[in-house]
UniProtKB/Swiss-Prot annotation:
Enzyme class: transferase
Record-given protein name: Thymidine kinase
GO-annotated biological processes: DNA biosynthetic process; thymidine metabolic process
Gene: tdk
Organism of provenance: Caldanaerobacter subterraneus subsp. tengcongensis (strain DSM 15242 / JCM 11007 / NBRC 100824 / MB4) (Thermoanaerobacter tengcongensis)
Family: Belongs to the thymidine kinase family.
Length: 193
């Protein structure tokens, strides 16, 4: 993790599978910035309404207020001039215009902290996340614990009716009754049809 001066913007990214503590780490960094009396704005995609529309919420229940946006460009529209730290959760749900938005905010001299899944349920790069990682000064890849064997988990297993989702299933399911588990490379299953 990098801490620059207030006149030097930079980008931090927190990635990993579900249940690895990404949102929890994002919230921790936001709270530290607030303790340091820095003005923080937090954004999240409107599609992420699992726990709350106007909060970033971790699986352990920690939460922090957030502004819900439907597209990346809204972040620039809502960004206040005196904001020093911008946090964006669930970056994988944004389109690729987020790359330019994040770059522009950092070029304004602001600290940008992004969090999201680096791989989809197939174990493949997820959305805009790899491109944000490429332009970041700092990337932290977190792991969870594999529910099958207990080893470090780097993947998210999607289960539908208790069975691994198939490779051809949609990447993003909104409002579906799927469940997810953290899995290691060996235990991660994605059947091809």
């Amino acid at each position: 993790m990098i801490y620059g001066s207030l006149d030097h913007g930079f980008i931090e990214v927190i990635v990993g599978p579900m249940f690895s503590g990404k949102s929890e780490e994002l919230i921790r960094r936001i709270r530290r910035a607030q303790i340091a009396k820095q003005k923080v704005q937090v954004f999240k995609p409107a599609i992420d309404d699992r726990y709350s529309i106007d909060k970033v919420v971790s699986h352990n229940g920690s939460s922090i207020n957030a502004i819900s946006v439907t597209k990346a460009s809204e972040i620039l529209d809502l960004l206040e001039e005196d904001t020093q730290v911008v946090a964006i959760d669930e970056i994988q749900f944004f389109d690729h215009s987020l790359v330019d938005v994040v770059r522009e905010i950092a070029d304004m001299g602001k600290r940008v902290i992004c969090a999201g899944l680096d791989m989809d349920f197939r174990g493949e790069p997820f959305g805009v996340t790899p491109d944000i990682m490429a332009i970041a000064e700092s990337v932290d890849k977190l792991t969870a614990i594999c529910v099958k064997c207990g080893n470090p988990a780097t993947r998210t297993q999607r289960l539908i009716n208790g069975k691994p989702a198939k490779y051809d299933d949609p990447i993003i399911l909104v409002g579906a009754h799927e469940t997810y588990e953290a899995r290691c490379r060996k235990c991660h299953e994605v059947p091809r049809t």
